[in-house]
Amino acid sequence: SFATGRYVHQTRLWDNAMPYDGSIPGWGHALQEKKIPVESIGKLHYRAEEDPAGFDVEHIPMMVAGGVGMVWASIRKEDERVYPKGRMLGDYIGPGISKYTDYDAAVTARTQQWFASKAASNDTQPWCLYVGLVAPHFPLVVPQEYYDLYPFSDLPAVKLHPKNGYQRHPWVEKQNAMMDSEAKFETDEERLRAIASYYGLCSWLDHNVGKILNALETSGFMENTTVIYTSDHGDNVGARGLWGKSNLYQESVSVPMIMAGPEIAPGTCDTPVSLIDLSKTIAMHFGADIASSNDTKSLAEIAKNAPDPDRVVFSEYHAVGAVSGAFMLRKGRWKYNHYVGFAPELFDLKDDPEELVNLADDPAFASTLVLLQSDLNQICNPDEVNAQAFADQATMIESYGGPEAALKLGAPGATPPPKVTL
């Protein structure tokens, strides 16, 4: 969706076993058609370097393992899926160095080299560079100095933990059961190490982003370069006893979205946006166009217009652990979570930004629920999309030899990074 500006149900690339291969044109292809140099450094998580994915050069790319992805996780029915024995967050949690922190350091160094080389070339042609850093993705291992920034006594309390009586939504309970990272902590102290490590990885990420921005300035490009900073998803970090992404709560679906550069006024835009807006943003910035979803708009255009707090933002999930399709609609103060075959959730993000109280069963909000359901149906038919996702995943699984063979395909956890020599 980030590459193409189309929703998941439009691309039909439902999960990590269906990585992007460039067959659906994206913003990179639009730039290539305009003869704009476009390169990438770092994590892409696409299928393979050989695919025409919209980059002239892909420097040290991290792709899905073996060009296949987590096929085992595409088996989503409760009576068929596998429950991994390992721990998603990593066998060890705490201060240290991992393959991912080494990789991020390499991506940062390669980006610094790229800017220096570009500046030395005296090439004045416009260019586009995508940089993909991994942190704060698990394993939750972070260099000591960043881990030490977050002593246990300063960590915020985890909200809505099941041990305090909170009952998860049935869909969420079934999704989480496939991994259940919370249940695999050996002690409460290890759980605190995980939280401190996650925050430390965020600071490690900030450190690398800072080095990249300093290199951009040193190279002389800062004043005439537009920079966009974002992420593909958030993380629950223990809220509701959940870790990772894979659900529709704000901790999981919210991402930073910062754009800075020439002719971009400082400030905050109150119009909701999503990752699919980036396709049109990048293409239009270079005078190109892209056949993206009708719902996409350029961030520059959105920022210049009057705020539209009621603009609809949509998300969906059909991947690891999802026993049925899950769909999110954000409109104004309202957040609507639709689960095929399960009761919905409704939150008032203005009065309840932490999503503590589900209003879906409150008769006082019945009309709001109906309106949001109608808005969702204008984007897609959840039942039809859910059926299509299961059908496409079943077809893919059969192409690999059936469920027994599929259960053995793909990385068991975090994708291994490439070996890098600088």
Locations of regions flagged by a protein language model:
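A contiguous, mid-protein "functional segment" used to position or interact
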Residues: P363-E398
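Formylglycine-dependent sulfatase
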Residues: S1-Y339, P344, P353-S374, P403-L422
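Residues forming the ATP-binding cleft of Hanks-type serine/threonine protein kinase domains
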Residues: K350
